[in-house]
Amino acid sequence: MKRQRIVIKIGSSSLTTKQGALDLEKLEGYVRAIVNLRKAGHEVILISSGAVAAGFSRLGYPVRPTTMAGKQAAAAVGQALLMQHYMERFHQHGIIAAQLLLTRKDFQNQTQYTNAYSALMELLKRGALPIINENDSTSIAELTFGDNDMLSALVSGLIHAHTLCILTDVNGLYDANPKTHPNAKRYQYLPTIPDEMLQMGGEAGSNVGTGGMKSKVAAAQTALSLGVDVFIGKASGEHALLDILSGKGDGTYVGNTGDLMEGKTKQWIRLHSPVSGVVRIDQGAERAIMNEGKSLLPAGVTSVHGTFQAGDVVHIWNEQNKVIAKGQVTLSSEQLRKVQGRKSDEAKQLIPLVRDEVVHRDQLVIQEKELNES
């Protein structure tokens, strides 16, 4: 089997008892399965939920708390306990486990995004096992990942994983909810995620998680767009993860992306970066960036809207005021207004240009379809 870089996402429902407490027997089973993956030569990154489940009983809650403050308090206690269990068990197999806590803000800020990438690459290089969870103690409702489902997809793209395994208590994707429709058909394989499946995914599943199939389907769609194949389903037994990689998993396989990986800079621009302004361009510039893969030059800019600095990200509009792309500018809005519509040689006479391009093609992502059809 070809050596792969694999992201394993374990949801709360797969790590807990019926009462919602952390199930150490289940955790031990996943540890053994991951150890076998590593022995087979694969690189593994673990995205693990379970901090709230591990901590709420220690604080005297009879059941999993439902308030944000309660969840954050339970996570503050539980994250340390969860990592302690993982580190002790992986240590028995000679594996160093490393903890990373992330929030959406870590993805939105380019410096923090790049730092997360560098840290993960160094850990893999050193043979450590990164264990990632959302920083539940500081996250707020608007910035959460949905039981780490979307977090696992974004991390998979960031580190150029070959496969994302989203493990849950349901054995795959169905054409209807199998809990309410006994004759629901399970999909063994899907080449893509149809839009209608996002609408029928349902809400949060068990009372110990925040994901549900809808968030898993959305995460799978994001991972596919980043060039990562996806498995959604169950994994029971120490050889379960190896079975998944060999095509014998108990769940649904999604996608066959091949080599469609997008670099981390373009991923950040497309998925995470805040937009600071708008640059409108003419038909010639639109054709150059859309059809010919070229950079945006000052000559193609017809107007500038908003206030931004060099290094900020802007939307690029065509003459019909449609968003066609998103890119990281090399000039401030003030500088760009001085040189818009000018050829590069003329622009250099007006302001000091570090580069000829307003937006280099390596910092530009086409977004016409995903933005204009929404």
UniProtKB/Swiss-Prot annotation:
* Ribonucleoprotein in keyword set: no
For this protein, the record's SUPFAM superfamilies field holds: Carbamate kinase-like, PUA domain-like
Q: List, in alphabetical order, the Gene Ontology terms for molecular function in this entry.
A: ATP binding; glutamate 5-kinase activity; RNA binding
- Gene3D superfamilies, alphabetized: Acetylglutamate kinase-like (3.40.1160.10), PUA domain (2.30.130.10)
Q: Name one GO biological process term.
A: L-proline biosynthetic process
GO cellular component terms given for this protein: cytosol
Query: For the PUA domain, which residue ranges apply?
Result: 276-354
Q: Where in the cell is it found?
A: Cytoplasm
Pathway, per record: Amino-acid biosynthesis; L-proline biosynthesis; L-glutamate 5-semialdehyde from L-glutamate: step 1/2
The name this protein goes by in its record: Glutamate 5-kinase
**Species name for this entry?**
Halalkalibacterium halodurans (strain ATCC BAA-125 / DSM 18197 / FERM 7344 / JCM 9153 / C-125)
